[in-house]
Swiss-Prot record:
Disulfide bonds: none annotated. It comes from the Bacteria. This is Uncharacterized protein ML2453. Pfam families: DUF2516. The chain crosses the membrane at residues 51-71. Residues 1-19 form the signal peptide.
Length: 87
């Protein structure tokens, strides 16, 4: 359980940092939610797995994994395509 929580935490932190480093206009150009909304979603995912992980348990880990997964699989590739960066 702890290994799963740590893996989701690392993934959520990576997604949060990646989202923070992107240009705000790239989100709207990719027709995705705005940058502040994604930062709130991914920040909540990080807090669900780190600070609140013991309160919410497996449910918090699953929610955080879904949020980070959606960003990394759907939003990140579109942002990189819009900005002309390679994956």
């Amino acid at each position: 359980m702890l290994v799963l929580q740590l893996a989701v935490l690392v993934t959520a932190v990576y997604a949060f940092v990646h989202a923070a480093l992107q240009r705000p206009d790239a989100y709207t150009a990719a027709e995705k939610l705005t940058k502040p909304v994604w930062l709130v979603i991914l920040g909540a995912a990080v807090s669900l797995t780190s600070i609140l992980g013991f309160v919410f348990g497996v449910l918090g880990i699953v929610i955080a994994a879904c949020a980070a997964g959606v960003y990394l699989v759907d939003v990140r590739p579109k942002l990189l395509d819009i900005q002309g960066k390679s994956r």
